Amino acid sequence: MSRARPLDKQRLVKLLQTEGEVVAVTGDGTNDAPALNFAQVGLSMGSGTSVAKEASDITLLDDSFRSIVTAVMWGRSLYKNIQRFVMFQLTINFTALLVVLIGAFMGTTLPLTVTQMLWVNIIMDTFAALALASLPADPNVMNEKPRPVGQFIITRPIWTSILGYGTAFVVFLLAMLLRIEITGGMDVYDLTLFFTFFVLLQFWNLL
């Protein structure tokens, strides 16, 4: 929309927002400032006026619209990486919680010690966060539809994956724990073996 009054541009932005749209506005002039300021995302050009830059959220230093596409791609990829880490983290905690809780009701030796859980939280979570944060942007995210406004970061498919993988891991680990108890009880070697399998399952979950 060009060659229009500033209030007309702002009115167009407001009408789109009332329809539930997330509006991004680009502009470089002073008359674009009201629309840039009112939009959810205001993008000004690096060669634009200082008024437009102050009213916007992002300034395109190279004045290239291609930079907008790149920014959207990286933003969506970063969001998916955060979702992957949350799913990985909650799967670990869900598995550990049920294994320790059910193991206590079974009357067995504590299958996961406090030191082991501290190691998992410090070592595995740190390296998992670094690995997921360093994933390159995926161009395929541009084929996805925009997310609804206010959508929770943990979606239904993520909850399904957490419960599905977590339950499978719990069943496997409890079966292993029960076999150890039947064959003579858990000693320090069995405890180490159990913890090793727990860590390997989480590495498989990360991959």
Descriptions of predicted regions:
Residues 1-25, 39, 46-207:
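Membrane-embedded transport module
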Residues 31:
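Conserved Rossmann-like nucleotide-cofactor binding loop
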